[in-house]
Amino acid sequence: MGNCLKVGILGAGNIAGSMAEALNELQKEGKACAYAVASRSQEKALEFARKWNITRAYSSYEELASDPEVDLIYIAT
């Protein structure tokens, strides 16, 4: 991930998927990357993280917001 802006995504639905796709493109340029995702369902968060190659998956929004590695949070709920 290097020096990219690490983005946390709140939510794991269609809008969140669009953002993850855009972040994967930005990661190629070293600008930003999808680093974490949070969903009320741990299973859904893990599935989303696997699909979009995201490092961390949380089952609560508070956990993601508390992660010191997250630079920016995108709210997709």
Residue positions per predicted region:
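N-terminal Rossmann-like dinucleotide-binding module
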Residues: 1-52
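Beta-loop-alpha module in the N-terminal Rossmann-like domain of NAD(P)-dependent dehydrogenases
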Residues: 55-77
